[in-house]
Amino acid sequence: MAIPVIDFSKLDGKERAETMARIANGCEEWGFFQLVNHGIPVELLERVKKVSSECYKLREERFEGSKPVQLLDTLVKEGDGQRLDNVDWEDVFVLQDDNEWPSNPPDFEETMKEYREEIRKLAEKMMEVMDENLGFEKGCIKKAFSGDGQHPPFFGTKVSHYPPCPRLDLVKGLRAHTDAGGVILLFQDDQVGGLQMLKDGRWIDVQPLADAIVINTGDQIEVLSNGRYKSAWHRVLATSHGNRRSIASFYNPSLKATIAPAAGAATEEAAPPALYPKFLFGDYMDVYAKQKYEPKEPRFEAVRAI
């Protein structure tokens, strides 16, 4: 079993209807799919690989003294059979428009700004496809994420590396969770695997595919679609060989945006009852920060009570 791979270039051709249907299936049945021929230049993706790898090499010594490494060393020395269940074997930093970026390598900032602009455009195009498939007005999801245009949506890029791990039996690369926000676009390593998503009780590998962009839907897309699209559990397994690169961009609501099931296109049938509460996304994030690695349903109930 493998997650869907969709040729995004066919969206603008004779196979548009079939491509729209495949994306709908990816959102409804999987919550994960891979896009090829998505429009981001391969030359840019090659530069992103280069600068992110060079950046990690400059940070590698810092990771060797990090909390996960120290905790694992202590656990191995004590040898009491416990696992590291509260940390991830991951070196990570987040890029936003207004925060401090690494100054080295010298071309890191220019390259990543160019990439973020391209991946943001792809995210917004994907949201318009979701709008159409769900029967929403064009721009509905983006408008909801911006609080009816009052606040800019959040757009952050998480740059991660998963170094080789000496004890795979004791720690995960990234613990299982669903993503809190909207649409997530991942440019993952095309050599070193490890990403898995949960479907029908089975963990499925998200196979490395050169120059593809992995799309997954977050909790807020589940709410806006009133459960038609589900956020999927996923995790990253640590590996004993290779250094896995992972660049995930998150197109999320503003913390001030109010999220609730959206009204679909007008039909003769009565709208289904809302299965999710109406809430402020900032309140949801407060709950998520404490319950990220726990089932999502209690999070929805918690914000219902606020």
Curated annotation (Swiss-Prot):
Required cofactor(s): Fe cation
Family: Belongs to the iron/ascorbate-dependent oxidoreductase family.
GO biological process: ethylene biosynthetic process; fruit ripening
Pfam families: 2OG-FeII_Oxy, DIOX_N
EC numbers for this chain: 1.14.17.4
Pathway in which this enzyme or protein is active: Alkene biosynthesis; ethylene biosynthesis via S-adenosyl-L-methionine; ethylene from S-adenosyl-L-methionine: step 2/2
GO terms for MF: 1-aminocyclopropane-1-carboxylate oxidase activity; L-ascorbic acid binding; metal ion binding
Protein name (Swiss-Prot/TrEMBL): 1-aminocyclopropane-1-carboxylate oxidase
Reaction(s) catalysed (UniProt annotation): 1-aminocyclopropane-1-carboxylate + L-ascorbate + O2 = ethene + L-dehydroascorbate + hydrogen cyanide + CO2 + 2 H2O
PROSITE patterns recorded: FE2OG_OXY
SUPFAM superfamilies on file: Clavaminate synthase-like (SSF51197)
UniProt domain Fe2OG dioxygenase: residue ranges: 153-253
Binding positions for Fe cation per the UniProt entry: 177, 179, 234
Leading EC class: oxidoreductase
Keywords: Ethylene biosynthesis, Fruit ripening, Iron, Metal-binding, Oxidoreductase, Vitamin C
Gene3D superfamilies: B-lactam Antibiotic, Isopenicillin N Synthase, Chain
